[in-house]
């Protein structure tokens, strides 16, 4: 039976994908006590294709970047479900970190990262409010 969070996702039209397997020498998540840390996610959509490809401030618009960040957050939720079995077990989203593929001079990474942050609040309510780091980089895998 789906929990409250999964019902909320379903009512929003969000289907969690099969969690991605690691592409190098790391694990998808680590649990230490009551803290769960999830490895970085790539912006694959439900169809298995990249939601956006290219640099923000170049070929990718802020709106498409936000969609990509949201896709990463959905993939993060899939990893959480794999780790916990039930998303209702999430007591709090503590921190999100986002690496934004950015052209030189692009400074709106925080606006892009809102695509992920907004989803956490949409799904978890006040428990989804979190600390955050957003870093612009010149290239990313994928």
Please provide the spans of the model-predicted regions:
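Short, polar/acidic, helix-capping and beta-turn segments at strand->helix junctions
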Residues: 1-142
């Amino acid at each position: 039976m789906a929990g409250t969070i999964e019902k909320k996702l379903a009512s929003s039209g969000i289907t969690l994908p099969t969690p991605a397997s690691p592409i190098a020498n790391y694990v998808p998540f680590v649990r230490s006590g009551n803290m769960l840390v999830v490895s970085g996610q790539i912006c694959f959509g439900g169809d298995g294709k990249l939601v956006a490809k290219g640099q923000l401030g170049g070929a990718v618009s802020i709106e498409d970047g936000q969609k990509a960040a949201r896709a990463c957050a959905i993939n993060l939720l899939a990893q959480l479900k794999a780790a916990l079995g039930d998303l209702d077990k999430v007591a709090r989203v503590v921190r999100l970190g986002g690496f934004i593929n950015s052209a030189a001079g692009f400074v709106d990474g925080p606006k892009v990262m809102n695509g992920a942050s907004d989803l956490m609040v949409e799904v978890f309510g006040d428990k989804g409010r979190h600390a955050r780091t957003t870093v612009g980089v010149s290239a990313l895998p994928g």
